[in-house]
Regions:
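Conserved N-terminal/central alpha/beta ligand/cofactor-binding core
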Residues: 29-30, 35-133
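N-terminal Rossmann-fold NAD(P) dinucleotide-binding loop
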Residues: 17
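Beta1/beta-strand and adjacent pyrophosphate-binding region of the FAD-binding site
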Residues: 2-14, 32
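Aromatic pocket-lining residues of Rossmann-like dinucleotide-binding sites
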Residues: 24
Length: 133
């Protein structure tokens, strides 16, 4: 049996677990993320539920990593040819037009953006994700 070692081990590929692994890997710590399914991102991906956030989320009350993720979602839609200019020019808009969340978007987009955030650390070996574990 091959022995593995890590500085940080996170069990749970939820959005919180994924961003915790991202934050740990960013500091250079060898990080293992164990995900229950074959997708990371929890609520935003596997559960297909938009983020449930407080009413001040656009100004305060979240980490820099999550704020960067939110910005990437909106940037994706700003570059989409079918989004009208009046919407593209707003600082904050809900791509899915939801009244439940301020940032409704499809699970596959959430997974794509999360994987893009993790990619440099996956490529360097700083982060390893164990799926369906």
């Amino acid at each position: 049996m091959k022995e593995l070692s890590a500085d940080v081990i996170i069990y749970g590929g939820s959005l919180g677990g994924t961003l915790a692994a991202y934050s740990a890997a960013k500091t250079g710590r060898r990080t293992f993320l164990f995900a229950e399914s074959d997708w990371i991102g929890g609520q935003l991906t596997v559960q297909a539920v938009p983020p449930d956030e407080h009413k001040f989320i656009e100004e305060t009350g979240c980490t820099a990593s999550y704020r960067a993720y939110r910005k990437k979602v909106r940037e994706h839609y700003r570059s989409h040819p079918y989004i009208i200019d009046s919407l593209k020019n707003k600082d904050y808009f809900c791509p899915g037009g939801s009244t439940v969340s301020r940032l409704a978007h499809p699970p596959k987009l959430a997974l794509k953006l999360l994987m893009e955030m993790l990619e440099p650390f996956l490529a360097s070996g700083t982060l390893k994700v164990f799926y369906s574990s």
